[in-house]
Amino acid sequence: MAETQAPTGYLFSEKHEWVKVEGDMALIGISDFAQSALGDIVFVDLPKTGKNIKQFETFGTIESVKAAEDLYAPIGGEVIESNSALSKNPGDVNSKPFDSWMIKVKGFSTSELDKLLTPEKYKALVAGLE
């Protein structure tokens, strides 16, 4: 298997979601490893704007031709936007997992970021799973 992508500027959960902080808001999506393991993604169910989510709790589901899986929030906060483009083109998560954010959140605690993995630590975690 090819080396998993884990770009600089992103933090990762052990459940294979990523977070990218941009000012006072953060983008959340799934990792390259997760999309590869799932296979062709056919549906993404995301929360509505205004929903409060908690770190490491489910915020939605993702379905592929292989399986349906829960999505876990790498950080908590208020959902300020869900990526509606994914309802029309869920396969974008496969082709560009780091450009295909799922939700934007604000009001997160920066201390929650300390519980996440750096790209290097995430690559080491994934290497142990392959």
UniProtKB/Swiss-Prot annotation:
GO cellular component: cytosol; glycine cleavage complex
Domain Lipoyl-binding: 25-106
InterPro entries: 2-oxoA_DH_lipoyl-BS, Biotin_lipoyl, GCV_H, GCV_H/Fam206, GCV_H_sub, Single_hybrid_motif
Keyword ATP-binding on entry: no
Superkingdom of the source species: Bacteria
Annotated positions of the N6-lipoyllysine modification: 66
GO biological process: glycine decarboxylation via glycine cleavage system
Pfam families for this protein: GCV_H
Keywords per UniProt: Lipoyl
Cofactor annotation comment: Binds 1 lipoyl cofactor covalently.
Name of this chain's protein: Glycine cleavage system H protein
Higher taxonomy: Bacteria, Pseudomonadati, Spirochaetota, Spirochaetia, Leptospirales
